A protein has these predicted regions:
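N-terminal subdomain of lithium-sensitive/metallo-dependent phosphomonoesterases centered on the IMPase/IPPase/PAP
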Residues: 1-194, 328-330, 469, 485-488, ...
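An extended, acidic
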Residues: 7, 17, 251-445
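DPxDG-like acidic metal-binding loop motif
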Residues: 188-198, 204-224
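Hydrophobic "anchor" residues
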Residues: 203-204, 448
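Short helix/loop capping segments that flank catalytic or ligand/cofactor-binding pockets
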Residues: 204-206, 225-227, 282-283, 306
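Glycine-rich phosphate-binding loop plus the immediately following alpha-helix
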Residues: 215, 219-256
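Conserved P-loop NTPase motor module
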Residues: 433-468, 558
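Short, basic, low-complexity termini and linkers enriched in Ser/Thr/Gly/Pro
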Residues: 473-475
């Protein structure tokens, strides 16, 4: 029997009739943009051909200023660090599963394709940030440390974990600053923190489905705690609400707290978004029972946080996209979505759950829901190490020293976004050599803008496509001796060397220890990841070839 309060956002579509005020970039502004970002754009053979900035909300929250992000180069670089990876995925990887006959579409193939898309997104995002940080003059210099990331955790029966990503601890900045990051970095260099999900909806990106995107924020705030890459239950909306302990409340009480914050008198006017997972069915049933609608999607729970409560965003029944109440997803998605929501004036509460319990296949939906806080010993140690044992629920204030420090976030649509329909996926005009991207920008002031940028492939589309692919593509299907020769050639080419190093760090971070500006490769960890099929024997050959060809990058193997 159909439930009118539970609907797939792919079938029951949101519309947006709110503010979307266009400001076309003049020729002078386009020229200035190209000059400001010439090193990044030249690296891929791009130039900005034109663009429009659509203002969605220009009100300020009164809690912040831009800080170091008064630099247009820095804040626009965050937009580029979302837009260019999205373009790269569409050039090489989007919808790849659809090119394979159905009878050959195995779980292993899907995971390989997902890793491919994560790899290329992480590659380009890293390169944009590194190239940008190398161009700042004395007095404007920054160093960026990755503090929050997605893709690390194993998903039993689904993914082996260790997906290509921008790992926690990754640094972007001038070499002399990175080498002194933990000892002797001068105060003139601004330290920034970064959170990212290089692709939210990676599965959708390989299937060619809606609402996949790239996502990151960069902030002046330091992080007080590290949030482990495990599942987080979340309660959030676009209005402030008082903190509560989820151990002491039930779903109806939680719904009332959030409804009151939003000024909603009747539950029959309210929505709470969920991922379509068995673990969520009991919560959805309870909320439906009191009149709350529960729209859902098959993948991706980051973007709803960015637009919930937006004026003019409505489902066909007239309800807005209001909240999440008890939804459970990845910790990185929670953080990367929660900070911009707080900048907009909202609130987000999280609580670490037991991933081992929630991924069991032998439990009913009711048992999954009831077991969500039954931690294993290892999970409890993670929770204690992150210092959540006395307060297991948290907000961004518990993670960050100052959430309202200067900061910018950016989210570029890989495919058409069904939560904000104006955010269309990357469009490629092969004949004209034009690539158009659509990026949502939210800054620490609470401003919301939609940046539509069209890039010209100066040397032609095929040349740009080759420049933007992952270095691993050049090593595919090669024998060991061929890999060694190809890697040696890469190391001896300045551009290829730069790209190879970023690939190596993003790909093999689970088996790397950074010390100063050098690395230690953990050979036994490589072998253990091969055993659990996160890496392959091909990866072993690549690692050994890189260590031999670029010994100056490494201290020793362990």
């Amino acid at each position: 029997m159909s439930n009118p309060l539970r609907y797939n956002i792919g079938d029951v579509r949101l519309t947006y009739t709110g503010r979307h005020e266009a400001m076309e970039l003049s020729k002078d502004k386009v020229s200035t943009f190209n000059l400001r970002h010439q090193e990044v754009l030249n690296f891929y053979g791009f130039e900005l051909a034109g663009g429009t900035v659509f203002v969605i909300d220009d009100r300020v929250n009164g809690h912040s200023n831009l800080g170091v992000f008064r630099s247009k180069q820095l804040r626009q670089a965050v937009i580029l660090a979302a837009a260019l990876p999205a373009a790269a995925v569409v050039i090489d990887g989007f919808g790849a599963l659809n090119k394979v006959p159905k009878d050959l579409q195995t779980k292993d193939l899907v995971n390989r394709l997902k890793r491919h898309n994560d790899r290329i997104a992480a590659q380009v995002m890293s390169e944009v940030l590194q190239i940008t940080t190398e161009t700042f003059d004395l007095g404007e210099e920054v160093i960026i440390e990755s503090a929050i990331t997605e893709g690390v955790r194993a998903k039993p029966g689904v993914e082996a974990g260790g997906n290509p990503t921008i790992a926690v601890g990754a640094l972007f900045g001038k070499e002399e600053h990175c080498s002194r990051y933990s000892h002797g970095l001068t105060e003139e260099v601004n330290r920034l923190s970064m959170g990212s999900d290089v692709i939210d909806g990676t599965g959708k990106s390989v299937e060619g489905l809606h609402s996949s995107l790239t996502a990151l924020f960069i902030t002046e705030s330091n992080f007080k705690r590290h949030l482990p890459d495990i599942y987080v239950e979340r309660w959030m909306t676009a209005a402030p609400f008082p903190e509560f302990n989820p151990r002491d409340t039930d779903l109806k009480e939680e719904a009332r707290i959030i409804a009151d914050a939003c000024g909603i008198k009747k539950f029959s006017e309210m929505t709470a978004y969920f991922l379509d997972r068995p673990r969520h069915h009991p919560a959805m049933d309870q909320l439906n029972g009191i009149g709350v609608a529960t729209p859902f999607d098959k993948d991706g729970d980051l973007f709803p946080a960015l637009v919930m409560g937006l004026d003019g965003l409505r489902f066909p029944d007239g309800r807005g996209l209001h909240s999440m109440i008890g939804e459970i997803g990845g910790s990185a998605e929670w953080t990367v979505g929660a900070l911009p929501l707080v900048w907009r004036g909202g609130q987000s509460l999280g609580m670490l759950t037991s991933q081992s319990s929630l991924t069991r296949k032998d439990l009913s939906p009711e048992e999954l829901w009831n077991e969500r806080f039954h931690y294993t010993e290892e999970e409890l140690i993670l929770l204690q190490d992150a210092r959540f044992e006395q307060k297991p629920f948290f907000t961004v204030n518990d993670l960050m020293e100052n959430p309202f420090a200067g900061g910018v976030s950016a989210f570029c649509a890989i495919s058409d976004n069904y939560f904000l329909p104006h955010l269309e996926g990357v469009k490629i005009d092969h004949e004209q050599g034009l690539i158009t991207t659509n990026t949502l920008m939210i800054n620490c002031l609470g401003n919301i803008e939609h940046w539509q940028l069209s890039f010209k492939c100066v040397e032609g589309f095929e040349t740009t496509a080759k420049k933007i692919r992952s270095p691993k593509s050049e090593l595919r299907n090669l024998e060991k001796a061929q890999i060694e020769k190809q890697v040696k050639d890469m190391v001896n080419n300045e551009t290829d060397r730069f790209r190879l190093k970023h690939f190596f760090i993003n790909e093999y971070y689970p088996a790397i220890i950074h010390t100063g500006s050098k690395m230690v490769v953990l050979e036994k960890t490589i072998e253990s990841m091969i055993d659990r099929k996160a890496f392959s024997e091909h990866d072993r050959d690549i690692v050994k070839a890189v260590v031999r060809a670029a010994p100056e990058w490494f201290i020793s193997a362990a």
